[in-house]
Structure formats: structure tokens, C-alpha cells
């Protein structure tokens, strides 16, 4: 277990991870963010945007990881909780609750904490998919294997360098649940150092303990995917079979009004600080009113994260975004929305109780956002 984030220290990071993997008392579990699967191939000669989910699992297996979990599982849980929080606020007609801003992008949250403290009060208290997955890994594997949480080592493969800082944030129970963060580029560097080629490894599969994620969970890695997931999940909760796919475009500001059941929701999806500032001025002036605001720092969302392969240009980003939307759609046979995901159903049954429960708030919500 580490309190070191290993910023710009790849050799030390790899050595620490190999030490954890070699310890027979440890169970080391790694999660893969959605944006990683459509970008890591660029480091090994694949075209941008190719979905290499199972090849990436195979690469991690070859590095010594026996248990691989999909970060979109945490996205499923995040959006399930968010949907219930928003529906509850709508039902009690709590206009002061809105607008609510997403918690998923640590880059935007860091910016907000320095430039717009008042806005921080409206950031969702629900932890990011990365952090939720880490919490679930620690608690569920500890329970299933009858091991102390300290011996469950939680590692994440992320498209964003700033996720290393996010790993230090605390949950409502005062704990942190991510031990190591490895960027996409660092994973490729580590593999090459070990003589591994993504093209030559066998495909792997997700851990039998936590095997599934939904279409909407995978879509989080590209701008607009979060809002699509939120609206689709809310619609399914209200028994309105509706998918909000109008956000699958690449403009930097996507504003929509969507009717779901008896509610008319105003939502917007943004990437980039400059675009956020434009929208914020309109919110503060009263020109615009939103129920939910998705903000992603990077162009096209997490697929354009600072931990992704270089060089990068607009065509590469478009290919990654398109590839991730296709990867998300492959999940339809398992689940479109979180509540259809068998793994999510099992976790609420065995660990979390129900959305918004005391246990869910303990394990899935941030204690404080101190950035």
C-alpha cells in the first residue's frame, strides 16, 4: 500500500508495483478506465480508436495481475446514485439543489476549487467512477476473500495524470481506496520494459468477482457520455424506455432540453475551461438555467487525457471518441443502463443496500472536496 503518487517517477512506480505483485499475502486488483482501451494500441502500432479491451486485460495478466476490473462498473454506480439524487430533488421541488455539476473530472474540479469556490458547493458529492471502483474493489474483495482491506492492493490504469492526485481524496468513512495510479503511457512503458508486446499477448477477461459493466458506463470516457448515461438511467428508473443519444457529437458545448416522464430537464455537456467560463457566465447572469452540467477538462473528454499516448491531434481524438462510442455499444447485450447490469445488482444486494443508503454514502461519497 502506498501514499506516494509517483508523479514523473515511472521506474520507481514499476518497482513498487512489482514488489506488491510478488508479495504472496497481497491480492492485487487493477481497474481499466474506458478511454485507455481505445488509445493504448497507438503505442504498439494499432490505429487510433481500436477497442483493445481484452488485449489490455491480457497485457495486465502478463504483467502479473490476476484480477482486472472495468472502471465503467464504478461509472454505473456513480450514475445510478446521481440519477436517484436528482430525481429525489425534482420530486421535492428543491430548486436550490440545482444546477449540479459532475464530480468525474479531477482536472476541472482542481480548476474550480481555485477559480470558482461557490461553484464547488454544487459539485456532486458522489465520488468519481475511478474512486468508486477503488472503494468497491477494496470492500468487495476483502469480504469475498476474508482478507483485511490493507492486503487488497488497488491499482488503476488511467488516461489522466491528475488521477494520481485524486487517489489521495478521502471518502465519507475517512479512507482512501486507490493505492497506485498508472497512466496509459506508463503502462505501455512498463510493458515494453518487460519485453511485452500488446499484439502478441493473449486476450484476457475481467475478474469473475466483478465481471460486468454497462453500455452507459463505458461511454463516460468521451464528452457527452456522462449526460447520455444520466438521462437514460433516469428514464429507465421512471419506466420510460428512452436513450439520450443526441450527445454523441463532438461540439465543445452541447446544450439540450430533454423531457423524461413528467420532468423537463435542461442539461449541458462542456469540454475545456474556456467553454465552461462562457456557460458559467450565462448561469450566473440568469440567462441559462440547468439541472445538470457535465464538465470535462480535456478535448473530447478522457480520450484526450494528459496520460494518453503522444503525439495527438484532432483526427486522433475523433478516432478515439468514435471508437469508444462503438465499444460502449458492444455492451448492449449485457446492459444498457446500470440497473440492468448483473454486477451492479449484486453489489447493491450484497454490499451497498440501495441508492442513497447510509452504506452507499459511506462507501461511494466523498468526505470533503479539499483540492
Give, region by region, the residue ranges found by the protein language model:
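Iron-sulfur-associated redox domains of electron-transfer enzymes in respiratory
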Residues: 5-371
Amino acid at each position: 500500500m502506498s501514499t506516494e503518487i509517483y508523479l514523473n517517477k515511472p521506474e520507481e512506480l514499476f518497482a513498487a508495483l512489482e514488489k506488491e505483485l510478488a508479495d504472496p499475502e497481497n491480492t492485487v486488483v487493477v481497474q481499466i478506465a474506458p478511454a485507455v482501451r481505445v488509445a493504448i494500441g497507438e503505442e504498439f502500432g494499432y490505429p487510433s480508436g481500436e477497442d483493445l479491451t481484452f488485449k489490455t486485460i491480457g497485457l495486465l495478466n502478463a504483467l502479473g495481475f490476476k484480477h482486472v476490473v472495468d472502471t465503467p462498473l464504478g461509472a454505473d454506480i456513480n450514475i445510478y446514485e446521481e440519477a436517484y439524487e436528482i430525481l429525489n430533488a425534482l420530486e421535492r421541488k428543491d430548486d436550490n439543489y440545482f444546477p449540479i455539476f459532475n464530480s468525474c473530472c479531477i482536472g476541472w474540479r482542481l480548476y474550480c476549487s481555485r477559480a470558482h469556490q461557490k461553484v464547488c458547493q454544487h459539485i456532486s458529492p458522489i465520488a468519481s467512477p475511478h474512486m468508486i471502483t477503488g472503494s468497491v474493489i477494496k470492500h468487495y474483495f476483502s469480504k469475498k476473500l476474508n482478507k483485511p482491506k490493507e492486503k487488497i492492493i488497488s491499482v488503476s490504469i488511467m488516461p489522466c495524470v491528475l488521477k494520481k492526485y485524486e487517489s489521495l481524496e478521502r471518502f465519507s468513512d475517512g479512507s482512501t481506496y486507490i493505492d497506485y495510479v498508472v497512466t496509459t503511457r506508463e503502462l505501455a512503458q512498463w510493458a515494453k520494459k518487460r519485453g511485452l508486446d500488446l499484439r502478441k499477448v493473449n486476450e484476457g477477461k475481467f475478474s469473475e468477482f466483478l465481471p460486468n459493466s454497462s453500455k452507459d458506463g463505458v461511454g463516460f470516457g468521451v464528452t457527452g457520455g456522462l449526460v447520455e448515461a444520466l438521462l437514460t438511467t433516469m428514464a429507465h428508473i421512471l419506466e420510460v424506455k428512452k436513450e439520450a443519444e443526441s450527445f454523441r457529437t463532438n461540439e465543445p458545448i452541447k446544450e439540450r432540453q430533454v423531457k423524461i416522464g413528467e420532468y423537463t430537464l435542461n442539461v449541458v455537456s462542456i469540454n475545456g475551461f474556456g467553454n465552461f467560463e462562457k456557460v458559467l457566465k450565462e448561469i450566473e447572469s440568469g440567462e441559462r438555467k440547468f439541472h445538470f452540467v457535465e464538465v470535462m477538462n480535456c478535448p473530447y473528454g478522457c480520450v484526450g487525457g494528459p496520460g494518453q499516448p503522444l503525439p495527438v491531434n484532432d483526427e486522433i481524438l475523433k478516432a478515439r471518441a468514435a471508437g469508444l462510442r462503438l465499444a460502449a455499444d458492444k455492451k448492449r447485450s449485457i446492459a444498457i443502463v446500470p440497473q440492468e447490469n448483473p454486477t451492479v445488482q449484486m453489489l447493491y444486494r450484497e454490499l451497498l443496500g440501495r441508492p442513497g443508503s447510509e452504506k452507499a454514502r459511506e462507501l461511494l461519497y466523498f468526505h470533503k472536496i479539499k483540492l
